[in-house]
UniProtKB/Swiss-Prot annotation:
Motif Histidine box-1, residue range(s) on this chain: 171-175
Catalyses which reaction(s): a (9Z)-octadecenoyl-containing glycerolipid + 2 reduced [2Fe-2S]-[ferredoxin] + O2 + 2 H(+) = a (9Z,12Z)-octadecadienoyl-containing glycerolipid + 2 oxidized [2Fe-2S]-[ferredoxin] + 2 H2O
GO MF entry, a single one: acyl-lipid (n+3)-(Z)-desaturase (ferredoxin) activity
Protein's name in the database: Omega-6 fatty acid desaturase, chloroplastic
Biological pathway: Lipid metabolism; polyunsaturated fatty acid biosynthesis
Species, as recorded: Spinacia oleracea (Spinach)
Organism lineage string: Eukaryota, Viridiplantae, Streptophyta, Embryophyta, Tracheophyta
Amino acid sequence: MESAITISNHVNLAFSLSRNPSLSTKNSAGISCIKWQRPCLRNLGHVRLNQQRKGTRRKSTLVQAVAVPVAQPSAFPPTDNTEHLKQLAERYGFQQIGEPLPDDVTMRDIITSLPKQVFEINDTKAWGTVLISVTSYALGIFMIAKAPWYLLPLAWAWTGTAITGFFVIGHDCAHKSFSKNKLVEDIVGTLAFMPLIYPYEPWRFKHDQHHTKTNMLREDTAWLPIMKEDIESSPGLRKALIYAYGPLRTWMSIAHWLKVHFNLKDFRQSEVKRATISLAAVFAFMVIGWPLIIYKTGIVGWIKFWLMPWLGYHFWMSTFTIVHHTAPHIPFKSSKEWNAAQAQLSGTVHCDYPRWIEILCHDISVHIPHHISPKIPSYNLRAANQSLNENWGEYLNKPKSNWRLMRTIMTTCHIYDKDGNYVSFEKAVPEESQPISIPKRVMPDYA
């Protein structure tokens, strides 16, 4: 997913890959850079093809075996690097921080390692996700209507999570992984986005660029990190960014929603017609749906039944997308340095959440396979992720949702410096960083 924050933070720490067979570490600003030997992964696709021809491909399970990358012997014991990554994982709230992916691994190598079944569209499963979202949303509205005031936050949390599922359904439609009928996808995607006041086509056009240029400086439309020049440009902007990346960070997708999707001048001429239709659908919901809600329940009812669940949706939109691509060890690269396979496999994070959240949100948190191929339907992401774990597991970033992970992101990953690592607001502008103390006080430091 996408998803959905205009400005994101990534550390300028990049695990340097070298053909030198030695392994060494050096520390800078509390974060270690690693040099390690590159495994020989050329001809990976050919090895797999030969296996298929010889009939060695496993047919009994969805997760199929392929040639697994194996590093050549190193001059230092591999436990050195393993122990170092374990220490980083503990510090940042991760279960695993992946080894650096070698330069000569390509997206084709990774995609061809996935079983063909994970790309197959199943209409029954697709419409099953719609049933789950509609049913869970209806239950949420019932809970809001019947709950006493002190239980309303729980009802809002459930309903906001349920309508996040609407976004994921539209997300599948935008990636052409919901139905083989493209008109059906356009209609379902538009309808799913309408109650979120999200214009479907404008989002789709911008989100496609996020996938083609993930973690690329200046180019990734969903992930544009704060740079030093942003902080230095204006006191007003600096103050706004400190608040936005402090207590308001888990709702920053609202800023992205407002800025990116409503100006037709931001789209190519060939995109304007479809963008206009989506905007008309959104405004129709506002003009018809909002007055109807207010007529039936009053302004308080509009707040209870629409606004609060909508804010709950944006909480998840922001949280998912922050965690998907933000960590002290995940680099942002210029277009000249950028490597597609490294950005999609190692620059993306798979995070486990409580299962009820994953069910209502259709496994959008299983995000690495989605970045390997957006054509994988949401209901096949777990099978694809299992295959990636079998064949590329050592390179994957894996946390479970926990306080230390969020505390690290919220209080550390602020200003991106091309010549160093993440710099927190507390270090860069200590006299103005009081808003950062709020999440620092509220969020416990345990994983």
